[in-house]
Curated annotation (Swiss-Prot):
Coiled coil: 603-635
Stretches of the chain found on the membrane's Lumenal side: 1-14, 91-188
Topology feature Cytoplasmic, residues: 36-69, 210-760
Tissues expressing the protein: Expressed in kidney (at protein level).
Name under which the protein is recorded: Translocation protein SEC63 homolog
The keyword Iron belongs to this UniProt entry's keyword annotation: no
Organism: Mus musculus (Mouse)
Amino acid sequence: MAGQQFQYDDSGNTFFYFLTSFVGLIVIPATYYLWPRDQNAEQIRLKNIRKVYGRCMWYRLRLLKPQPNIIPTVKKIVLLAGWALFLFLAYKVSKTDREYQEYNPYEVLNLDPGATVAEIKKQYRLLSLKYHPDKGGDEVMFMRIAKAYAALTDEESRKNWEEFGNPDGPQATSFGIALPAWIVDQKNSILVLLVYGLAFMVILPVVVGSWWYRSIRYSGDQILIRTTQIYTYFVYKTRNMDMKRLIMVLAGASEFDPQYNKDSTSRPTDNILIPQLIREIGSINLKKNEPPLTCPYSLKARVLLLSHLARMKIPETLEEDQQFMLKKCPALLQEMVNVICQLIIMARSREEREFRAPTLASLENCMKLSQMAVQGLQQFKSPLLQLPHIEEDNLRRVSNHKKYKIKTIQDLVSLKESDRHSLLHFLEDEKYEEVMAVLGSFPYVTMDIKSQVLDDEDSNNITVGSLVTVLVKLTRQTMAEVFEKEQSICAAEEQPTEDGQSDANKIKAKGGWQQKNKGPKKMPKSKKKKPLKKKPTTVPLPQAKQQKQKQANGVVGSEAAIKEEEDDISDKGSDSEEEETNRDSQSEKEDGSDRESDREQDEKQSKDDEAEWQELQQSIQRKERALLETKSKITHPVYSLYFPEEKQEWWWLYIADRKEQTLISMPYHVCTLKDTEEVELKFPAPGKPGNYQYTVFLRSDSYMGLDQIKPLKLEVHEAKPVPENHPQWDTAIEGDEDQEDSEGFEDSFEEEEEEEEGGD
């Protein structure tokens, strides 16, 4: 537009507003995310768990790790400098004068709004005498006073002030840019262009490009996409993977390849040390040629993993590489579990026979290998080796004991304290207390299972093809809590038995002679007799008396006989009346019982409706909580003697058919189980009615021998037939018929009107 000019900030006042906002947008989020956490809290936490986790490798590495004292200090200095700059700019903004102020003639004349004309004239006289230029006053102030007086007394000036905010009428409004004028100065144009070019043409493309290059190489779980492709190929190729094959495929991940991961290193000494470890292990097949499983980096990772599972001592130059490899194993095994599940889903969706799904054994071997990698144990080793001070030498004393045959952690926990102490007599008191402390920290998880069909009238009735929802409630306790409860129960059971034995001894001591004289009596079995119904019986008179009465006065006898007959008739009538009344009372009772049964049914139905409504509300609340809450994945640290990183307790939960060796529901990775957790497992019901027996598995990804198994029985019924007639449909049809009738009536009425008009 012609004549348009941009006004930049010459004074720098408006630029301070922009600069303050910009600095605040940087400093506030940076303080939240970059302010160093309290190191003392971490030290206190490590001190509190030292009794249990003091022998773990990750605990010792955490203590040996040098504390980063310089980096937190630098962060604090930078953030504090940013806050100082922000506060300085805010103070500067608060002290700057406003360039645009609304014109108010009352303020110029030092009057309150709404002053009268007389007050205005009086104040004008006083101020004009004071600021008149002829009397040595301020000329500018005098002009402002005259302008304000005219705005309040002159009709036209007052109207302009009320409408436009100025007694002189509408004025030109100017808008400025909150940037200093030196930025657009011709002298500084080259410098400004260089800064803009560096920021938007070099720095920004480099940042976006590096982020994009990284994002296309990694998946959402920070696993290389090339690794996922390798796992998918070999899992599909080998349908049933044993443990050796699984370790071989795991070691082929691109995370261990220096070409794709800079954190992975390859040293010249590996050509000497790795063959030595291969000879010591002695169970590695080097004849197959399956790249990348036979590449040098994959072979190195496999050897380091096998040496870790065998708890072998390796050279110090390889320890760092082994720790790096072990830290990657849990995430890689979780990715392999996901790949197996995806292939199973693809096999179910496709009806091609050539597409073969991985077996359930392959999936369970992946989960088993995760436990082995965390605990540093081979496949068939005893779970008791997870405990401290229990090694191969003294394990035989525990597992091959004559009285107690202890094979699992649960067997050791189920013993009494005295038996446990005698079994572990080869340990010193301090070591025994440490073993008990570690054993008490192990998790004990219970499962409560409930199967139902959501969004159905009869949620407990499972029909063919319905979507079954299995609600599993997990409750985590420690082994210490479990054997504390068992000890209290045992003590409560022993007390009454001891009291009973002492009472029996007292009785024997006092009255032993009574027991000698009196033998044990056998009580006859009492049989319950059925109550007999009493019939009305008439007592007959003796014959001699009857004959005497008849001979003495026959008339009286005849009258008496007549009276007796009348009494018999009256008795029969009374009996019939009693029977009728009994029938009436029975019918009334039956009616009352029917009413009571109806009431009971109504009450039962109302209770069922309330229970269903409560379950529905609970499910809705559960879903809302799952959507809104973001639970932390920090649950409980795992006791692992040879794992180099602190790991949290996580679990896999799934349903399988052990008989058919098929996976029913996909594994759910439970990462937030602290105390209790509710998990929903969904799967389609079988296609045929009948009784089905499944198994719910809860497998740990860190501990060996602590898996939980619970049976799940399903009774599948035929699907309900689709109703052909429904009252709602009848009303809809009637409404359509009424509408058609009304339309037909309107058409006939219109035709009659047209005929009448034509006749006219």
